[in-house]
């Protein structure tokens, strides 16, 4: 289901009534049970392995680890896994692999390697493996580092596919280069722009891409939500933003939530998306780009919506099924398994 249903509409959101900017990685923000929880409640064995720990608590919500039917841990904090909280312990000894560096291919390879081992030894009914997009943020397709990553990924997909399982491979978003010809980040700092246009009024720009992993993207993405202190200025602000050539889409909250299935109470008064090679920032002073060692690659806009959707069933032609969303992965995996 889309975020209008489950409530998670980004890494980060803002509550105007309290003035709080909050990471959305706590299960309290979930508005529905997870697929894993519902299958677990029906007696299924579940395995969830994430690269970043920020996802683990969300995806593991509702699982119980005292019945030997659930395993949920991250490679980032694999050394902290316990039977009580994760359904597994001494992960690094078990996998014979140390805790990987967060900003590396190794973080994702740990997930895939553990997934193959868990499939063989634990035989879960449902397994979910979530890698990190660090390599995609840093290296364009065809770069030797990117090729090395996909070679590794393909190796483990092959090992998984040797088993009698239904397998779906997809992504949460695409990725595009967001730099000028000199290799410097292309960014529109919308909060600065609005302060210049409306010096007596306050606007808050929130970038849902924001998370602690600033080396990936410097908190610059192609999607932004804007909160207006003075609601009467929303229409005027929309018209001003539409004059920025590098902003591709500007919508009111109501329009954006209807088109993109977002939760209204966690969305800004204005929703913006930048053009293919640009990102959006809040204020120039808030973005520390010193950690970006490679040319910026990021996501969040209309040009990063297309993602791969790969299945391992020769009996299903998904190209004839019309629009498919990445969240349909479990539907098709279950459909293939039933056949």
Residues of each region from the PLM?
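Feature captures the catalytic ectodomains and active-site-proximal regions of enzymes
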Residues: 1-339
């Amino acid at each position: 289901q889309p975020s209008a249903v489950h409530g998670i509409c980004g890494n980060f959101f803002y509550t105007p009534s309290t003035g709080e900017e909050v990471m959305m990685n706590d299960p309290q923000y979930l508005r529905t049970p997870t697929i894993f929880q519902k299958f677990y409640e029906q007696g299924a064995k579940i395995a969830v392995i994430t690269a970043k720990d920020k996802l683990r608590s969300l995806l593991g919500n509702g699982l119980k680890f005292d019945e030997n039917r659930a395993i949920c841990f991250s490679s980032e904090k694999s050394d902290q896994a316990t039977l009580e909280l994760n359904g597994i312990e001494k992960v690094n000894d078990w996998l014979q692999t140390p805790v990987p560096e967060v900003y590396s291919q190794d973080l994702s390879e740990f997930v895939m390697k553990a997934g193959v081992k868990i499939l063989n030894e634990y035989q879960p009914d449902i397994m979910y493996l979530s890698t990190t997009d660090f390599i995609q943020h840093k290296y364009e397709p065809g770069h030797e580092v990117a090729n090395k990553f996909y070679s590794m990924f393909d190796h483990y997909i092959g090992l998984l596919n040797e088993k009698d399982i239904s397998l779906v491979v997809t992504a949460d978003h695409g990725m595009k280069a967001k730099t000028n010809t000199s290799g410097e980040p292309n960014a529109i700092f919308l909060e600065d722009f609005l302060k210049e246009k409306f010096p007596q009024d306050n606007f808050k720009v929130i970038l849902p891409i924001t998370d602690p992993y600033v080396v990936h993207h410097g908190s610059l993405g192609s999607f932004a939500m804007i909160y207006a202190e003075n609601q009467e200025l929303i229409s005027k602000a929309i018209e001003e933003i539409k004059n920025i050539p590098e902003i591709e889409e500007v919508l009111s909250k109501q329009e954006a939530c209807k088109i993109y299935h977002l939760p209204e109470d966690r969305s800004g008064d204005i929703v913006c998306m930048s053009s293919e090679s640009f990102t959006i920032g809040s204020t120039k002073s808030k973005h520390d780009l010193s950690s970006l060692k490679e040319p910026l690659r990021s996501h969040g806009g209309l040009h990063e919506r297309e993602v791969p959707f790969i299945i391992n069933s020769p009996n299903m032609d998904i190209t004839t099924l019309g629009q498919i969303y990445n969240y349909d992965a479990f539907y098709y995996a279950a459909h293939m398994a039933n056949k």
